């Protein structure tokens, strides 16, 4: 079965972690949407779709639709833990019909305070300092020894953070030493702490979290019960990412069965309240953030882009913008997914980059562009990704090309920019994270001090001998993209920006019921940290 519609359906099911057998293909292709099937499979714990399981899941969705109006609020999502915010959470259901595109409305001048955005960018010289970029520094050969070195590096870096910042109640034991003395450490009076990579994370029937903690010496099976006062973000309720670094305090339960480590508490890497650096008053310019332009796609919003260029040239707020950060997927690419060609209006990859260069030439010359790659760009898919090839770069001016992720400073303000592919893994694993709230994934990355912990998930990773996806320094501004949402907010002193897209809703997003938030330019002043979200749609 190879129709374009089936390919899109199959892609959606695969993205949801479902395996489709041949016997179920005809039945699924006849469905109007696979969204109810995916939701029923997730709530039932089903991963293999055959003829029988599909019929059973469809029966569940049919029954739920009959009782929904009497028992459930239309926008509620019962698979997530209850939060303090009683508003609806989860996916935003998008219209089934493709929206009719109308010309963009003329913009009024931005209403902003000159105290928040005090300086024109043309008066200030550029000051971009790159702290880390993988370009030209990748040394992996893809061997098992490289993978082992990468995980040892991750464990060593984050364990040292835990020890230096005092987040552990005592000095941790090596797993081998803890196991050797398990009969001594068999009650709360003899509690110990271990630190390692979490894996094989599962919830038991009683609601406890069962997982393995592995360090350089051995593995130990652990179990964690939700505390009575646990918040929805506590690991016992929210979950753990495979291969994230955790500390665990507790004791061994020994008896007739194999000993298991009873976890009284779990410890995350340190993330205190961060004090942001500020650009000096004489450098009080702004940075603008955008991602996922997807030039070359038929759903690229060209009229709105022209409107943004007009804003850059004429709006008083735009005159404060010194830097324009594009966090990946500047073009839609070629051959990224099956059937992509029919969604493209520029089908040659170099022509896509050439047209993007021409469009960026229209940005005023006082603005410096910082461009990262993403999963649609012409670089290796494995992260960390190097900058775009010099053959592509030669068409651009006033553009600094960096890798993904990139840790850099603008007039002393530390910025961590990451395209955000691993948000897919956070959505698939943690109960608190949804595509409609990408800021929860960003918060989880900061709390774990790692951008993409899970090996073998939805995010391809390069096993560099030193794990360069660890977050060694807390950024002043943390920027992501990828899922076509938008958010600006603070988490423990770090300003989080989830950059908007310049692509309309795609067929794939419509099938998933996801409504993007396109054409929003985020502007942040580097001295005052005042921010403005400029809407162009």
Question: What is the role of each PLM region?
Answer:
Residues 1-537:
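Extended recognition/assembly regions associated with phosphoester-bond processing machinery
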């Amino acid at each position: 079965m190879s129709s374009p519609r089936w390919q899109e359906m199959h892609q959606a099911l695969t993205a949801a972690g479902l395996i489709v057998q041949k016997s179920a293909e005809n039945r699924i292709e006849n469905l109007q949407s696979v969204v109810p099937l995916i939701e029923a499979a997730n709530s039932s714990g089903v991963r293999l779709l055959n003829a029988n399981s599909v019929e059973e899941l469809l029966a569940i969705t049919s029954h739920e639709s009959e009782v929904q109006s009497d028992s459930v609020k239309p926008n509620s999502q019962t698979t997530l833990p209850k939060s303090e915010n009683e508003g609806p959470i989860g996916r935003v259901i998008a219209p089934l019909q493709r929206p009719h595109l109308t010309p963009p409305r003329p913009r009024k001048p931005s209403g902003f305070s000159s105290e928040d955005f005090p300086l024109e960018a043309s008066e200030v010289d550029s000051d971009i300092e790159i702290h880390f970029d993988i370009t030209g520094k990748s040394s992996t050969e893809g061997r098992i020894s490289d993978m082992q070195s990468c995980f040892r590096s991750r464990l060593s870096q984050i364990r040292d953070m835990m020890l230096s910042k005092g987040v552990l109640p005592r000095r941790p034991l090596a797993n081998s030493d803890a196991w050797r003395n398990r009969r001594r450490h068999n009650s709360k009076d003899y509690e110990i702490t271990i630190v390692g990579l979490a894996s094989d994370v599962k919830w038991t029937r009683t609601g406890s979290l069962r997982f393995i903690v592995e360090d350089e010496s051995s593995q130990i099976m652990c179990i964690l019960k939700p505390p009575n006062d646990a918040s929805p973000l506590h690991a016992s309720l929210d979950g753990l990412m495979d291969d994230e670094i955790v500390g665990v305090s507790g004791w061994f339960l020994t008896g007739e069965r194999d000993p298991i480590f009873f976890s009284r508490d779990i410890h995350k890497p340190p993330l205190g309240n961060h004090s942001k650096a500020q650009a000096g008053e004489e450098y009080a310019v702004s940075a603008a953030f955008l991602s996922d332009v997807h030039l070359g796609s038929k759903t690229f919003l060209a009229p709105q882009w022209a409107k943004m260029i007009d804003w850059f040239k004429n709006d008083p707020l735009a005159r404060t913008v010194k830097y324009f950060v594009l966090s990946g997927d500047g073009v839609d690419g070629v051959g990224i997914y099956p059937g992509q060609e029919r969604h493209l209006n520029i089908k040659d990859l170099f022509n896509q980059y050439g047209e993007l260069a021409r469009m960026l030439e229209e940005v005023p010359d006082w603005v410096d562009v910082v461009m990262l790659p993403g999963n649609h760009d012409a670089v290796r898919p494995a992260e960390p990704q190097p900058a775009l090839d010099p053959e592509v770069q030669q068409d651009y001016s006033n553009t600094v090309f960096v890798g993904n992720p990139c840790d850099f400073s603008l007039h002393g303000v530390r910025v961590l920019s990451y395209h955000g592919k691993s948000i897919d893994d956070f959505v698939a694993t943690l109960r608190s994270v949804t595509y409609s709230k990408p800021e929860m994934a960003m918060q989880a990355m900061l709390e774990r001090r790692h951008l993409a912990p899970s090996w073998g998930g939805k995010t391809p990773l390069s096993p560099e001998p030193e794990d360069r996806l660890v977050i060694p320094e807390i950024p002043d501004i943390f920027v992501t993209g990828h899922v076509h949402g938008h958010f600006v907010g603070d988490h423990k002193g770090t300003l989080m920006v989830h950059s908007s897209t310049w692509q309309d809703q795609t067929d794939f997003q419509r099938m998933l019921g996801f409504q993007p938030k396109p054409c929003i330019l985020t502007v942040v002043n580097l001295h005052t940290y005042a921010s403005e979200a400029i809407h162009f749609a």
